Amino acid sequence: MSIYLGLFEFEGPFVEHDELKDESGVYAILHFVDNEYKLLRCGERDSLQKWASRVKLDEIKHRLPGKMLLTVYYTNFPKEARKSIAKAITEEFRQQARVSYLIKPTLQAA
């Protein structure tokens, strides 16, 4: 399944971190509530799989009503370009008043 965020086609939603590829890209954690997607967090990582393996997604799910989705956009763009994509998506959601909490996921110890 694909989810379009801005001009980018994100893959997902993913339930388990081992479903992700060990590649660089942009991630978005979405909260589906009241029949719309709200953005919880958007960012970039050199290894989406490694990052996702450390995020305590279950902890977030228990704190929020509705459904939480992890989506990714794989790209080998340089880090600064990936940051720009994440920033643009965050701003788009803010302008549409569709930002939900903008939380920072808790990471497990490496």
Description of each model-found segment:
Residues 1-54, 77-91, 95, 103, ...:
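GIY-YIG nuclease catalytic motif and its immediate N-terminal context
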